[in-house]
């Protein structure tokens, strides 16, 4: 969960997890009974995020058995020339054999040993749809144990002001999401995941940002198979409290943040859909700029160090005075959350476009690829106005129409992640009427007018070569 949780077997603690929403587990001999355990004390804190923090078990609990010697982990690092570096971690000394299977289950390469390099002849590359998200399987055996790891062969890199996938300039057409549904909150639902992925395809989108935490592993498996790009984000949300509190001095977060980042990368390292790591969402980078840099830049370096595929790394920023931010400009891709026309310059789209362009001129000077990692407008489904007034479906269309036109003028602007895929629940408050209504779909997945506009827009934007 987003808060601390503990796993007990027969009332004995065997594992715990402190808010990374990734995974945790433990070796155990015997037949267990598993129950959720509450902390002895419920600390009073100051949460700073805009989604409902559900409690309970959200994702599958799996009990499995292994031989005495078994495979603990597999790492796959493929290259577009067909060479594949692999490493198999085992608990013993039994010999390891690996075989690469193609999408039809045919063996195309094999090797012996816990690590090495093998070559796939006439390799098929993984690409997002409408390309082919081709998947291979590394079939590893160690004694009696078997481990199958799917992988895709693709490259991802930043070169100048472009993001290149398999050497081709990429444009992200994406949604920010939440694990949330009207019937069961954040509870894992494989059927809903299939529904959402089909809607992503229907919308002519190609990407998802896992705002603001790592999602269930099964969602990444689905994105691998369905050819959807993923910006994978840690649960570091809203670190900051304004000018009165320096979070980098007041809160002991750094060590835990390093652990959470390492666990996310370890879990998701083999997914071809994951093309970008996000260190966190909307921290305070403005009031204590040097302390912020000293906190975040080591995490940036750690992500590059830990990722065997060395994907690009970013940090999603949201500052009133972006000129004071000395951290975002050091990331591989500049990702900005901005609400011109909504929270800022509310309802005045002429002024909103002017403010956006003033800021984009600033980021152009950094000579980095730039993406809008969040932007949106609360929209009440069924609310219509003669003019494009705030909260109406007409305003949502006008909001995206005007801002998107500004993005298209700039060759170094490489993507847009709209906020949000669907309406979702939040804590109650004077700014929220039954949750956040910025979804392009309602909470039960019905499209608003803004979604029909974006569907048409994205149909006209190719995944590759849009701004060549």
List each language-model region with its residue ranges.
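Generic beta-strand/beta-sheet core signal
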Residues: 10, 173, 210-211, 233, ...
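The substrate-binding groove and active-site-proximal loops of carbohydrate-active enzymes
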Residues: 46-50, 178-191, 199, 203-211, ...
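Secreted/periplasmic carbohydrate-active enzymes, especially glycoside hydrolases
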Residues: 1, 5-6, 10-217, 222, ...
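Substrate-binding clefts and catalytic carboxylate motifs of secreted carbohydrate-active enzymes
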Residues: 42, 49-56, 68, 273-277, ...
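Short hydrophobic/aromatic-enriched beta-strand-loop microsegments
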Residues: 227-234, 332-338
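Active-site-proximal loop/turn and secondary-structure-junction residues that shape catalytic pockets
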Residues: 157, 214-216, 236-238, 280-283, ...
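Aromatic- and acidic-residue-enriched segments that line the glycan-binding/catalytic groove
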Residues: 20-29, 224-229, 244-256, 291, ...
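A short beta-to-alpha transition loop/helix N-cap that caps and shapes the active-site region
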Residues: 14-17, 241-242, 287, 323, ...
